[in-house]
């Protein structure tokens, strides 16, 4: 029997001298949230990241995920692929609400969905991820105040939840293959595992 895939709270914390603050680095399948004045950073290829924050309290977080490349109808909200995407978003939103964020104050900035991984589906996996995150946030009535989606370049995203500031650096030359390998490994794990449990928003 396959083990379940669960979104993991990022554990890679360090001090960033350039920005003079504590920083959390998140990898595919991870998320992080905080009420502190700190930085959350990730590098995206085909994956997407939603930076969600309470614009009043400054409680915010970021996730990093992609939809599994499963068979069936990828647009069907009941498909395993769509259920995993909803799960990845709900884990972050629930953690923000538990930390004291108010649903009516949530706003989002979304990034990624680049055309970086090839050969997963007939539809570009990055486009699928980007469309999913837009549709999910619209359905949840969470306003998207900024986005940088699709394109062919990976991105490095710096998110300061306390202020809502985001810096995006497009990586025109990605000379190492770490990012692509990391996303391919993540996609393989998603495809060979089932989603853990159901998550309900409260």
Curated annotation (Swiss-Prot):
Pfam families: CheD. This is Probable chemoreceptor glutamine deamidase CheD. Keywords: Chemotaxis, Hydrolase. CDD domains: CheD. InterPro entries: CheD-like_sf, Chemorcpt_Glu_NH3ase_CheD, Cytotoxic_necrot_fac-like_cat. Its EC number is 3.5.1.44. Probably deamidates glutamine residues to glutamate on methyl-accepting chemotaxis receptors (MCPs), playing an important role in chemotaxis. It comes from Thiobacillus denitrificans (strain ATCC 25259 / T1). SUPFAM superfamilies: CNF1/YfiH-like putative cysteine hydrolases. NCBIfam families: PRK13487.1 (NF010013), PRK13489.1 (NF010014).
């Amino acid at each position: 029997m396959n083990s379940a895939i669960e979104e993991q709270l990022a554990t890679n914390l360090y001090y960033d001298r350039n920005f003079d603050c504590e920083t959390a680095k998140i990898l595919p399948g991870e998320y992080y949230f905080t009420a502190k004045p700190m930085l959350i950073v990730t590098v995206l290829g085909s994956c997407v990241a939603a930076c969600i924050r309470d614009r009043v309290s400054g409680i915010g977080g970021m996730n990093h995920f992609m939809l599994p490349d499963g068979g069936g109808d990828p647009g069907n909200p009941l498909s395993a692929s769509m259920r995993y995407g909803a799960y990845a978003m709900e884990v972050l939103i629930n953690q923000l609400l538990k930390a004291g964020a108010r649903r009516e104050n949530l706003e989002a900035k979304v990034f990624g969905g680049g055309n970086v991984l090839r050969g997963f589906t007939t539809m570009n996996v990055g486009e699928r991820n980007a469309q999913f995150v837009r549709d999910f946030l619209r359905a949840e009535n969470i306003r998207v105040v900024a986005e940088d989606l699709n394109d062919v370049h990976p991105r490095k995203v710096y998110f300061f939840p306390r202020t809502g500031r985001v810096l995006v650096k497009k990586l025109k030359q990605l000379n190492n293959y770490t990012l692509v390998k990391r996303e391919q490994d993540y996609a393989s794990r998603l495809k060979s595992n089932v989603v853990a449990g159901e998550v309900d928003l409260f």
